[in-house]
UniProtKB/Swiss-Prot annotation:
This is Arf guanine nucleotide exchange factor sec74. Residues 1-152, 227-249 are annotated as: Disordered. It is found in: Cytoplasm; Cell tip. The SEC7 domain is sufficient for nucleotide exchange activity. The gene is sec74. GO terms for molecular function: guanyl-nucleotide exchange factor activity; lipid binding. Keywords: Cytoplasm, Guanine-nucleotide releasing factor, Phosphoprotein. Guanine nucleotide exchange factor for Arf GTPases, stimulating the nucleotide exchange from the GDP-bound to the GTP-bound form. Involved in vesicular transport. The modification Phosphoserine is found at residue 67. InterPro entries: PH-like_dom_sf, PH_domain, Sec7_C_sf, Sec7_dom, Sec7_dom_sf. PANTHER family: GUANYL-NUCLEOTIDE EXCHANGE FACTOR, PROTEIN MON2 HOMOLOG. Residues 1-12, 57-83, 234-245 have a biased composition (Polar residues). Residues 228-420 form the SEC7 domain.
Length: 928
């Protein structure tokens, strides 16, 4: 402390001591000298200790003062008359001292108190003077010592007193008047003028926040039960308040109670018949405040005002905001009308604008409207103090009744709405910042009801739209890593583009190698597609069964031994046949077969490849059926430079395999899915027909697979007329089966894509949600994990349906070419009847079809299809009297005349003593 400050402090304390002593009877001189010396020693000790905090004492004798001189004092001390008893006077003064001390936030040590009076000639206009009778009450402020008080306030307080008592101070005329009487309340009020004070204007909900100035400055709150600062600050001069308002950046006149306006103060301007949407909006924006504009525009029922309301709200940006937070943002700026119909118009327009900004979150604007209205009803129900039975979470989900939205999303809406009420921000000149970024004061941490730590309203006083936008999106959690939509979209059943066609795959299957199995207990024709035992066909020769191998190789299987361990990789041999995947742990045997196949390819031989030696049995370690099987992958490379793909069974069990290059990966995917498509439909991939002139005792002619004897193109022309006609009818049956399967797959694909669209909307909704409570975030994280699994399974099914439809349509196109081929082989005289009925197509009402498994069994054993035919014609018997032509299904190009009979396929497979499957092809049909 410098010399000037020391002199000022000494003079201030000296004057204070003289003023105090002027109101007390003079005690003996030794005691008076002792008090002065103690005061001086205390001041010198204070100056020597620079780290100690300066403290001030106030000791005065309060006379009997009329209430008209001190209204504040009379308000807090009760009656203006005081008791002459020293105890009662000291008690009343003690109560007043405690109240004043809480307002001043100061402490006074005992050693600075003095009960000695000095000469009555020493008086000050700033302290109360004695009455005419010379007696008064002792009003010493006996306060506890607080060592934790900041030194900045004490320094300011001390410097202010030094200024008051310095010779340079210029008191007012009223203060210099000898008849002016000051009280302790007035002294406290004049002392509090050094602290900043200001009025607030903010929200209708919540508590006022502190200003964004230095947090060390004390700002008294209004209506505080802990201090009297709000009452004393009211006596601060207007000039002082104006300066404080300027320091806080607020307007001088920002009293919310005096400047508030309501919706009833405004009305819809007059509208002429020549007014347009633009002119009406100009009138409304010129005469009506922004927060009341939607409510005013909703008062009219004309379509023109609805367009005005829609255009006015079209500038509001709701992109990437959840619906509940968008509703908060909307109600923070705009005021809803009072009538129900008008509220309905405003909320309907809000829903349209929200759906326009976020078309991927909901199915339609009507869905947004239902949710918005449900949220408003929930808010009204929950925060209504007269409603004892609050709406529960389960009741809210049940009342909303939107099955396409996940319950976890509705639960998040419920938690956010019930956590804190909606807030409307008044648009006035006061600039108030949010308290969320400031450290709470001591009174806030001690449990002030206006500043709760557990449920603090962060939307209460936010008037800046940009900051409000940041607050509304500050609770969003990152669920992208859990959902991982990119991985879901990368699921493919074929890596190459474009995928190989069915014609290309048929050519590869026609040249596929064979495994030969020798059986001594079976007849040669036992493994034919349609076998009827006869005495003539019995033979003692062993039967050789040819098993076509569509694909074989060595794969790395990835499997988990235990849940807590990493993947274990092991090599397995895999053989793909027409009906199953066969796995062998003996990879050396598979490696030998691969070597034989490579040698055969280098020989450029046109005959089929037969693996040697012949097998007495074919026992795989485990088998996976191809029915309802799908193979998929994403083409991504995993560790050790491998490409992985998965095979998913009908029972949802998944097997993961790895290959060394992407070409091998794509080859496995395409061939597995191709064979699985026909195995699921109850068909087999087409093969070449055996020679019709071969002997029945030929081993290779006894099986339905491709032998090493090629078909002669002239063989068909030698067949009888009835046989040729039956072959064409057989082809029609296959067309019917394939068409039926395509129709069912397309229906399943539409349903799967619809479910996938709903799941994508739910995923986007979860990513945009902003849960406030931690328990809501935990539920959303669990829901995201479950949703990811469902979306992945649905995407796999969609890809399976797509590739199956592709292969079946290509096979259907091949059937039409096959019929043309057969007609070209048969003589024209034989095909005359067929040509006459060429315009008659097979009736295909796919919805009323018989059991597929029963139908497949009937076709394979050669039974008649009368039951199938009756089932097919049952739905069209009632329509026989209708028009000749009608549209089939949803395709207007497919027209049928009279219901055509299904072909009778009994015994139609016999051609020169040979029985063939409906899935076989002539040899020269597959072009080289």
């Amino acid at each position: 402390m410098d010399e000037s400050s020391r002199i000022a402090s000494s003079s201030a304390l000296h004057g204070l001591d003289e003023m105090v002593s002027a109101h007390k009877p003079s005690p003996p001189l030794p005691s008076r000298r002792k008090g002065k010396s103690a005061l001086r020693s205390a001041l010198e000790k204070k100056n020597r200790k620079s780290k100690s905090k300066p403290k001030v004492t106030i000791t005065s004798d309060t006379p009997k003062v009329s209430s008209q001189h001190s209204p504040v004092s009379s308000a807090y001390t009760g009656d203006s008359t005081t008791d002459l008893d020293s105890k009662s006077g000291h008690s009343s003064s003690q109560k007043l001292s405690n109240k004043v001390s809480s307002a001043l936030k100061l402490t006074i040590p005992k050693r600075w108190r003095s009960s000695k009076s000095s000469s009555s000639q020493c008086s000050s206009p700033f302290l109360p003077t004695s009455s005419s009778n010379g007696h008064g009450d002792d009003a010493s402020l006996n306060l506890p010592d607080k060592k934790s008080r900041p030194s900045s306030q004490s320094s300011i307080f001390l410097s202010n007193w030094s200024t008051i008592f310095s010779s340079n101070a210029s008191p007012t005329d009223s203060q210099l008047s000898p008849t002016h009487t000051s009280t302790i309340a007035e002294l406290a009020a004049s002392t509090l003028s050094i602290f900043p004070s200001g009025s607030y204007a903010g929200s209708t909900f919540g508590s006022p926040s502190r200003s964004s100035i230095d947090s060390s400055t004390y700002l008294p709150r209004s209506k505080s039960v802990n201090s009297l600062s709000s009452n004393f600050s009211a006596r601060t001069p207007a000039s002082n308040q104006s300066s404080v308002s300027e320091d806080f950046g607020a307007a001088p006149n920002c009293d919310h109670k005096h400047n508030s306006v309501t919706l009833s103060d405004f009305a819809l301007p007059d509208i002429d018949q020549h007014d347009t949407v633009e002119t009406i909006l100009e009138k409304v924006e010129f005469t009506i405040p922004k927060q009341f504009t939607p409510a005013i525009l909703s008062q009219g029922t004309s379509s023109l005002l609805k367009l005005c309301l829609r255009k006015y709200l079209s500038v509001v940006n709701f992109k990437c905001i959840s619906l509940d937070m968008a509703l908060r943002k909307f109600l923070a700026v705009y005021v809803l009308p009072n009538e129900t119909q008008q509220i309905d118009r405003v909320l309907s327009t809000f829903s349209d604008q929200y759906f326009h900004c976020n078309p991927d979150l909901y199915d339609s604007s009507d869905e947004c409207y239902i949710l918005t209205f449900s949220l408003m009803i929930l808010h009204t129900d929950f925060f209504n103090i007269h409603n004892r039975q609050k709406m529960t979470r389960a009741e809210f989900i049940s009342n909303t009744n939107l099955p396409t939205i996940l319950p976890e999303i509705l639960e998040c809406f419920y938690d956010n709405i019930t956590y804190t009420p909606f807030v409307h921000v008044e648009h006035i000149g006061c600039v108030v910042t949010s308290p969320s970024n400031e450290k709470p004061s001591l009174s806030q941490r001690l449990g002030d009801s206006q500043f709760r730590l557990t449920k603090r309203n962060t939307f209460a006083t936010e008037s800046d739209h940009q900051a409000l936008q940041e607050q509304l999106t500050g609770f969003r959690i990152n669920l992208d890593s859990i959902l991982d939509l990119k991985k879901i979209d990368s699921v493919r059943t074929s890596i190459e583009s474009p995928t190989r066609t069915a014609d290309d795959l048929y050519k590869e299957f026609a040249r596929a190698p064979f495994l030969q199995i020798v059986s001594h207990r079976s007849q040669p024709q036992a493994f034919s597609y349609h076998f009827e035992p006869s005495a003539e066909s019995e033979s003692t020769n062993p039967a050789i069964i040819n098993v076509k191998v569509f694909k074989l190789g060595i794969l790395i299987q990835n499997e988990k031994v235990r849940k807590d361990r990493l993947l274990s990789n092991r090599e397995v041999g895999v053989i793909l046949t027409s009906s199953q995947l066969m796995f062998f742990k003996n990879v050396y045997w598979i490696s030998g077969l691969l070597d034989q196949l490579e040698d055969f390819k280098r020989s450029h031989s046109f005959s089929p490849c037969y693996f040697s030696p012949h097998l007495t049995s074919l026992s795989a370690d485990y088998i996976i059926p191809l029915s309802d099987l799908v193979a998929y992958g994403d083409g991504s490379r995993i560790e050790n430079e491998l490409y992985s793909f998965s095979v998913k069974q009908k029972n949802q069990r998944t097997h993961v395999f790895s290959v060394t290059n992407v070409d091998e990966l794509n080859d496995w995917l395409v061939k597995i899915n191709f064979v699985s498509t026909f195995a699921t439909a109850g068909l087999a991939p087409r093969e070449r027909l055996p020679c019709v002139e071969s002997s029945d005792k030929s081993i290779k002619a006894s099986v339905s697979v491709l032998p090493d004897i090629y078909e002669d193109s002239d063989a068909m022309s030698k067949a009888s007329k009835e046989t040729r006609s039956e072959v064409l009818e057989c082809s029609k049956v296959r067309v019917y089966i394939v068409q039926n399967r395509i129709y069912k797959l397309e229906e399943a694909l539409r349903q799967g894509e619809s479910k996938m669209t709903v799941q994508r909307r739910n995923a986007a909704n979860i990513l945009h949600l902003e849960p406030i409570q931690s328990r809501t975030r935990i539920r959303l994280a669990r829901c995201s994990n479950t949703l990811k699994k469902n979306m992945l399974a649905q995407m796999i099914e969609i890809q399976k349906f797509k590739i199956s439809i592709k292969f079946l349509k290509e096979d259907l196109e091949m059937d039409s070419h096959l019929q043309d081929y057969l007609r070209s082989v048969f003589p024209s005289s034989v095909m005359g009847k067929e040509n006459a009925s060429e315009d008659t197509i097979l009736e295909s009402n796919f919805r009323n079809h018989s059991n597929p498994s029963v139908r497949r069994s009937n076709l394979r054993v050669g039974k008649t299809v009368e039951s199938v035919q009756n089932t097919k014609l049952k739905s069209v018997e009632n329509d026989s009297g209708k028009a000749e032509t009608e549209t089939v299904g949803k395709n207007p190009e497919v027209v049928r005349k009279s219901p055509a009979k299904l072909p009778n396929i009994a015994n139609i497979m016999t051609v020169n003593g040979h029985r063939y499957s409906v899935v076989e092809l002539p040899d020269d049909f597959l072009r080289e």
